[in-house]
Swiss-Prot record:
Residue spans of biased composition, Polar residues class: 399-409
Gene Ontology molecular functions: zinc ion binding
Swiss-Prot/TrEMBL keywords: Host cytoplasm, Host nucleus, Metal-binding, Transcription, Transcription regulation, Virion, Virion tegument, Zinc, Zinc-finger
Organism listed in the record: Human herpesvirus 6B (strain Z29) (HHV-6 variant B)
Keyword Metal-binding among UniProt keywords: yes
Function: Immediate early (EI) protein that plays many roles during productive infection including regulation of viral gene expression and nuclear export of intronless viral RNAs.
Protein name: mRNA export factor ICP27 homolog
Main location: virion
Gene Ontology cellular-component terms listed: host cell cytoplasm; host cell nucleus; viral tegument
Protein family according to the UniProt entry: Belongs to the HHV-1 ICP27 protein family.
Superkingdom classification of source: Viruses
Cellular location(s): Virion tegument; Virion; Host nucleus; Host cytoplasm
Length: 516
């Protein structure tokens, strides 16, 4: 407030009026005074938002709402196409990805003369054959033309073949049996990345190995996360904080605690700045994924070939060596020592492949399913079918009719009298001179049981069979009442309850063997 007798200056009056006008425009209050240029622009931006009124939407009919829904979906597809242009690359020519200008002599490579198969056959077959060599030395990977031939084969694939190949690789990554297989896949992609950086080749973002590095980052973290990482990182102290750093490095949310650095700052750090080997290995994969994302963006914008050296400012690819990630992971887990049995068991499980536990088969040879495999598989793998050996005995789940079963005397429910003599059942033996036309009794029973299962029962027949069964039971009971019964001690089998109790007892102290 100004003192009495002092008038406000004209400048302050205009400033206060402009502030009041902006405040009214923000709160959508009508005003009769002049509106500043800022308020006009602000109100113009709010005009489309006013059109989305609930009363107007309620006034629309069902047809108009369907049309509005169609328009919104089309706009969303256009937005997705613009945002995902880096992924699909629809308007890019093949010139930035072509490597026809590069030869073995210009790159300083030597021809590969090892035992590995031709890259065209490997890409066609999707997985190695039996006893095929896939473990290569570092010199064979970086100094020969083997990876260059892989690059040429991948560039020559059609869009459908490339998508099929990438889908198979992503499926194998997400369903990896153990951490060892995931680490081997990550090493394969990083070695391919190293080869492009070493020989300064232009990057193809649609490449099989380049495209799936981002997927590898998340699957690599998922496999590592199966271990008790808070205990593994606790060797140098602060295991919880180091685990949260790993989550930030992989882009996973950390909401339960405030971290000193943001996710962006952690991902920009070099691998050498981290304390633990697992963090260093993850930092290498994250750095390669970030470089590829930047390369994709520049290819979309410039439509020119891009190289790794132009984006790898910290020279991470230059310092990377083939097999470095597996050595870092092995170093971290092998040097970890703790008294936690669950931590040791987890490390052992994630490093060893899972073992299937199929103890018996429920399929018969006749009903066994036959799985059709991919037509591009090798010839020796095309005729695979999941079958079980032929069963000669009748399955326990099937049943036979009462007229086909051998007639045996029924025991009485009473426990008195002398034992009765078991009646012998005579089964006609098949003629050995005509084996081709004769069927065994078991096969006849199986066929009749299958026919009975497939037949629709008649209610009248069911009632007749039930009455006939009751009549047979009554006759058998009346016959056995007048007969003498055997004593209880000579017939009844004593259950060895002590043996069952010993075998069914669960020993709760079974952790001593694990700790040893």
């Amino acid at each position: 407030m100004y003192p009495r007798g002092v008038k406000r200056s004209q400048h302050d009056r205009h400033k206060q009026t402009a502030f009041r006008t902006i405040k009214r425009s923000i709160t959508h209050r009508p005003t009769s005074k002049f509106i500043s240029h800022f308020a006009k622009n602000f109100r113009g931006k709010l005009a489309p938002l006013k059109q989305l009124d609930e009363s107007r939407l309620d006034a629309l009919s069902l047809t108009e709402l369907e049309q509005l829904k169609t328009i919104i979906e089309e706009k969303q597809q256009e937005k997705r196409a613009q945002n995902n242009a880096i992924t699909f690359l629809p308007n890019l020519p093949t010139v930035p990805f072509a490597d026809t200008n590069f030869s073995i002599k210009s790159l300083g490579l030597r021809p590969y003369n090892g035992d590995a198969r031709d890259p065209k056959q490997r890409i066609r077959d999707r997985f190695p054959q039996t006893h095929e060599r896939i473990c290569l030395l570092t010199n064979d990977i970086l100094e020969t033309d083997l990876l260059l031939r892989y690059r040429q084969c991948l560039d020559s694939l059609t869009r459908e073949e490339n998508q099929q190949l990438m889908g198979d690789r992503i499926f194998s990554l997400t369903n990896s049996p153990c951490l060892a297989f995931t680490v081997a896949t990550v090493e394969e992609a990083c070695s391919y990345f190293k080869f492009h950086d070493l020989h300064n080749l232009p990057v193809n973002p649609q490449d099989l190995f380049m495209y799936t590095i981002t997927v590898m980052k998340f699957e690599f973290f998922n496999k590592l996360n199966m271990a008790k990482l808070t205990c593994v990182f606790n060797d140098n102290g602060h295991g919880d904080i180091e685990y949260r750093k790993l989550r930030q490095l992989c882009g996973k949310p950390v909401l339960d605690r405030e971290m000193p650095n943001s996710e962006f700052e952690v991902q920009q750090q070099t691998p050498d700045s981290f304390r633990h080997p697992i963090q260093q290995a993850m930092s290498i994969v994250v750095t390669f994924a970030r470089i590829l994302r930047q390369i994709k963006e520049h290819i979309i914008r410039t439509k020119k070939p891009q190289f790794i050296r132009d984006f790898d400012t910290e020279r991470v690819a230059e310092r990377y060596e083939c097999g470095l990630i597996s050595r870092l992971i092995g170093k971290q887990f092998s040097n970890h020592k703790c008294d936690d049995v669950s931590c040791q068991n987890r490390i052992e499980r994630i490093m060893a492949p899972w073992k299937p536990s199929l103890f018996f088969c429920t399929y018969f040879a006749k009903d066994a399913p036959k799985f059709k495999l991919f037509p591009n598989l090798p010839h020796e793998y095309r005729n695979l079918s999941f079958t079980c050996p032929k069963v000669d005995m009748e399955p326990s789940c099937s049943y036979s009719t009462s007229r086909d079963l051998p007639q045996t005397s029924h025991r009485s429910h009473k426990n008195q009298g002398t034992p009765k003599v078991k009646s012998k059942v005579c089964v006609e033996k098949p003629d050995t001179s005509n084996l081709t036309t004769t069927k065994t009794t078991t096969e006849i029973l199986i066929e009749e049981s299958m026919e009975t299962d497939n037949k629709i029962p008649d209610p009248r027949e069911l009632n007749f069979n039930q009455a006939k069964q009751d009549e047979i039971v009554i006759i058998n009971i009346n016959e056995n009442v007048n007969s003498k019964h055997e004593s209880e001690s000579s017939v009844e089998m004593d259950l060895d309850l002590d043996y069952e109790a010993d075998t069914c007892e669960t020993n709760l102290n079974t952790y001593s063997s694990d700790s040893e």
